[in-house]
Design a protein with these regions (language model features):
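Two-component/phosphorelay signaling modules centered on CheY-like receiver
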Residues: 16-35, 104
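Hydrophobic/aromatic residues positioned on beta-strands within the core alpha/beta folds
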Residues: 87-89
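Active-site beta3 strand of CheY-like receiver
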Residues: 50-57, 61
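Acidic catalytic/metal-coordinating carboxylates
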Residues: 39, 65-71
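Alpha4 helix (beta4-alpha4-beta5 surface) of REC/receiver domains from two-component response regulators
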Residues: 68, 91-110, 117, 121
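His-Asp phosphorelay/catalytic-motif detector in bacterial-type signaling
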Residues: 51, 78-83
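Non-catalytic signal-transmission and effector/linker regions of two-component phosphorelay proteins
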Residues: 1-10, 14-16, 115-135
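Residue-level signal for the "D+5" position in two-component response regulator receiver
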Residues: 36, 61-64
Length: 135
């Protein structure tokens, strides 16, 4: 499977360690093509340019709400149907936004901390399994 055939995942987070971890889990281990975006300055246009099959967005991006980016992504025709995983350690906020999640649609929650199996199983369910690269 070539890079262009692997499912593409764009990850937005303001924590470089988290981005490195997600790249290790999803690209190096699971075989997805991963694009990393460092936080609050990320725009929906940048995400759309990466042509993702899946978005993973943290809810708190350096003081800016990740919800804003989710809403902007949904308003962009190129991202309107792309599934989104929102990540947060703030379980209370996730519960408060349940109605909004349902209204926006195709939004999935990943509570921090999460295990490697949790994230890979959710990603597989949403975009399919990547074929592990050899060599």
């Amino acid at each position: 499977m070539t890079d262009s055939e692997r499912p593409r995942i764009s990850v937005v987070n303001d924590n470089p360690d988290f981005l490195e971890l997600m790249s290790a889990i999803l690209d190096e281990d699971a075989g997805y093509e991963v694009s990393l975006f460092a936080g609050e300055r990320t725009t929906a246009a940048e995400l759309a340019a990466s042509a993702p099959d899946l978005l993973i967005i943290d809810l708190l991006l350096g003081g800016v709400s990740g919800w804003e980016l989710v809403v902007l992504a949904r308003a962009d025709q190129r991202l309107a149907d792309v599934p989104v995983i929102v990540c947060s350690a703030d379980v209370a906020e996730l519960r408060e936004r349940t109605g909004e999640l349902e209204r926006i649609g195709n939004i999935h929650v990943l509570e921090k901390p999460f295990g490697v199996d949790q994230v890979t199983e959710l990603v597989e369910r949403l975009v399919g399994r990547a074929v592990t690269r050899t060599g």
